[in-house]
């Protein structure tokens, strides 16, 4: 994505007004998982569908103990007016998450969410369709970046979130196209002796030049 914020880095100590009051971003991210997502601007139709879908998926995020935090370079007043459009698109899913206002672009730059190719009417760069997953330690665990022409897939966001949360509890990784409930890969750094203690349910070994051990975890 460019810039200096990378996986494993601490969330910057930044703050801004939002649709739900003033928010200190690092404090907001403490003691749980957080998704920070940006959009190019208020009212564009793709952005409306995205934020509506996020609102509709909120019960799934709540099940996983995840807080949501939106962001664009528009004002709080713009956000509040736009929420009416969003809730018209998904009438059964109210917008229950805050949206940060960042007209001076300070937070967008600090979180590495700027799109240098997209400009507003005054020639200022806009936020990209970026999405960051922040762990309970307030460090960046995953980033997704989409161009303005492509809306995000929130089933994929849930999938990678499930993977991250499992990997935070167990010495495992998830294979290609993995879905929740499917077998996972025991880390190669775990010896068979140690694996017997960590995974008493056992595992299945896939015969490859370097053995692949698959098991199930919750």
Curated annotation (Swiss-Prot):
Its EC number is 1.11.1.24. Pfam families: 1-cysPrx_C, AhpC-TSA. One of its GO terms (molecular function) is thioredoxin-dependent peroxiredoxin activity. It is found in: Nucleus; Cytoplasm. GO terms for cellular component: cytosol; mitochondrion; nucleus. Disulfide bonds: none annotated. Residues 5-166 form the Thioredoxin domain. It catalyses: a hydroperoxide + [thioredoxin]-dithiol = an alcohol + [thioredoxin]-disulfide + H2O. It comes from the Eukaryota. CDD domains: PRX_1cys. Keywords: Antioxidant, Cytoplasm, Nucleus, Oxidoreductase, Peroxidase, Redox-active center. GO terms for biological process: cell redox homeostasis. InterPro entries: AhpC/TSA, Peroxiredoxin_AhpC-typ, Peroxiredoxin_C, PRX_1cys, Thioredoxin-like_sf, Thioredoxin_domain. Gene3D superfamilies: Antioxidant, Horf6, Chain A, domain2, Glutaredoxin. The active site is at 47 (cysteine sulfenic acid (-soh) intermediate). The active site is a conserved redox-active cysteine residue, the peroxidatic cysteine (C(P)), which makes the nucleophilic attack on the peroxide substrate. The peroxide oxidizes the C(P)-SH to cysteine sulfenic acid (C(P)-SOH), which then reacts with another cysteine residue, the resolving cysteine (C(R)), to form a disulfide bridge. The disulfide is subsequently reduced by an appropriate electron donor to complete the catalytic cycle. In this 1-Cys peroxiredoxin, no C(R) is present and C(P) instead forms a disulfide with a cysteine from another protein or with a small thiol molecule. Thiol-specific peroxidase that catalyzes the reduction of hydrogen peroxide and organic hydroperoxides to water and alcohols, respectively. Seems to contribute to the inhibition of germination during stress. Associated with the rehydration events involved in the recovery of the desiccation-tolerant moss. Belongs to the peroxiredoxin family. Prx6 subfamily. This is Probable 1-Cys peroxiredoxin. The lineage of its organism: Eukaryota, Viridiplantae, Streptophyta, Embryophyta, Bryophyta.
């Amino acid at each position: 994505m460019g810039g200096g914020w990378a996986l494993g880095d601490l969330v910057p100590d930044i703050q801004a007004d939002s649709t739900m009051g003033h928010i200190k971003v690092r404090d907001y991210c403490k003691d749980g998982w957080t998704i920070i997502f940006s959009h190019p601007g208020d009212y564009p139709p793709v952005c409306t569908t995205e934020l509506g879908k996020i609102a509709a998926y909120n019960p799934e995020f709540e099940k996983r103990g995840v807080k949501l935090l939106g962001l664009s370079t528009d004002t709080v007043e713009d956000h509040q007016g736009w929420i009416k459009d969003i809730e018209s698109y998904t009438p059964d899913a109210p917008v229950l998450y805050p949206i940060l206002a960042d007209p001076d672009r300070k937070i967008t730059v600090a979180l590495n969410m700027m799109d240098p190719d997209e400009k507003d009417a005054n020639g200022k760069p806009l936020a990209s369709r970026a999405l960051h997953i922040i762990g309970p330690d307030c460090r960046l665990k995953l980033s997704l970046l989409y161009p303005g022409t492509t809306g995000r897939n929130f089933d994929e966001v849930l999938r990678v979130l499930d993977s991250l949360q499992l990997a935070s509890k167990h010495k495992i990784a998830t294979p290609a196209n993995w879905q929740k409930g499917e077998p996972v890969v025991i880390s190669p750094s775990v010896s068979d002796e140690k694996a017997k203690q960590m995974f008493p349910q056992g595992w299945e070994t896939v015969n490859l030049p370097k053995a692949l051990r698959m098991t199930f975890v919750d």
